[in-house]
A protein has these predicted regions:
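N-terminal loops that bind phosphate or other acidic moieties
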Residues: 2-351
Length: 351
């Protein structure tokens, strides 16, 4: 049986022999050791990923995957499914938060139709790769077939390889899809063996009654699909086409030795699947922020992650990843450009 990793090159482990040398270089920059805080750990990680003491950020890119979810018919979101297509049109017109933030971060932005249910406007900025016109309702049946999940993984990987061929070495992923917090919560619950109540948040703004309804719907769905245990089966049962494409994108980005900016709750749920398929992907991930959405901090704990930002974001779209990109630039720049005590002629003798 074909597995998702068969169409990907292996993910190379980071060079632990280089770690000590990079740490020495960082510690001997013209600053007290540790005084750049979390940026020092980030610079070390980027140096390890790029295998150099002179890292560079080249043609950074953000890919936003959009798709609809059949579970939306269960009333788990206060917004109608049509909002997904409306927001994609907004992305294409340049009017969303991710457009503004990727512009500030000087990042390429690509919008991918992974499976939006409603028609989308024609645009040169849209990459149309729909696996289907929305997933099925996983409260009743699996969201997609295993073959659909595999096709989505391959499509996401192909988009990353496209950007790698253009020189991209830093990449982030965003998403859009009404009810995709429900899919992400079920992925988290099953893959981390966490009660669904700890995974479910208000999403786009559910009130208390709506939150209770969402929890009940998802609890029943998890019970109905108790047989889905293997990561690809979990993805096919509960995931969305945009989440599956993002999973493939993570795997390809790690295999291409890219620095990967991880966004919020939904993006991290896709990483949970990717990690189960290829654990080495984690080494290439920079966690941009701690989302305000319930469950995200538990995911971050699972990955042993210390996010760069804590801004109470809960928008998605890749906004947190875009906001963190300037910090990646800064970390790479200080490692590559900052003088050492010796080269600058600065006295570093103990007081």
């Amino acid at each position: 049986m074909t597995t998702p990793t068969e169409f990907l090159p292996p993910i190379a482990p980071l060079d632990e022999a280089l770690r000590k040398r990079l740490q020495h270089v960082i510690d001997h920059k013209t600053k007290p050791p540790g005084s750049l805080g979390q940026l020092e750990a980030l610079a070390l990680q980027i140096g390890l990923i790029q295998r150099t003491e002179q890292p560079r950020v080249q043609r950074p890119a953000m890919i936003l995957f959009a798709g609809d979810h059949g579970i939306a018919v269960e009333g788990v979101s206060p917004y109608p499914q049509s909002v997904t297509a409306q927001m994609v049109a907004n992305f294409l017109a340049g009017g969303a938060a991710i457009n503004a933030f990727s512009g500030v971060a000087q990042s390429e932005l690509e919008i991918v139709d992974a499976g939006v249910a409603s028609p989308l406007p024609a645009s040169e900025r849209l990459v149309s790769l729909p696996i289907g016109r929305g997933t099925r309702n996983f409260a009743v049946e699996p969201a997609m077939t295993r073959d659909d999940a595999m096709a989505a993984l391959a499509a996401g990987a192909a988009r990353v390889r496209h950007h790698a061929a253009l020189g991209t070495n830093v990449i982030g992923f965003g998403e859009m899809g009404i009810a995709n917090t429900s899919a992400a919560a079920c992925l988290m619950s099953r893959l981390l063996d966490v009660p669904i109540d700890a995974c479910v948040g208000r999403g786009t703004g559910l009130d208390d009654q709506g939150l209770a309804h969402k929890r009940a719907v998802l609890a029943r769905a998890l019970s109905r699909h108790s047989h889905a245990i293997a990561p690809l089966d979990v993805l096919a049962t509960f995931g969305g086409f945009e989440i599956a494409m993002m999973t493939g994108a993570y795997l390809a980005a790690a295999s291409e030795r890219m620095t990967i900016l991880v966004d919020g709750f939904i993006s991290t749920s896709a990483l949970l699947v990717a990690e189960r398929l290829a654990p080495g992907v984690r080494d290439y991930c920079v966690f941009s922020h701690a989302s305000h959405e319930a469950g995200h901090r538990r995911m971050l704990e699972h990955f042993g992650a210390k996010p760069l930002l804590a801004l109470d974001l809960r928008l998605g779209e890749g906004t947190g990843a875009a906001l963190a990109l300037p910090l990646v630039r800064a970390a790479a720049a200080f490692l590559a450009e900052m003088a050492s005590f010796e080269s600058a002629g600065v006295d570093n003798r103990d007081a």
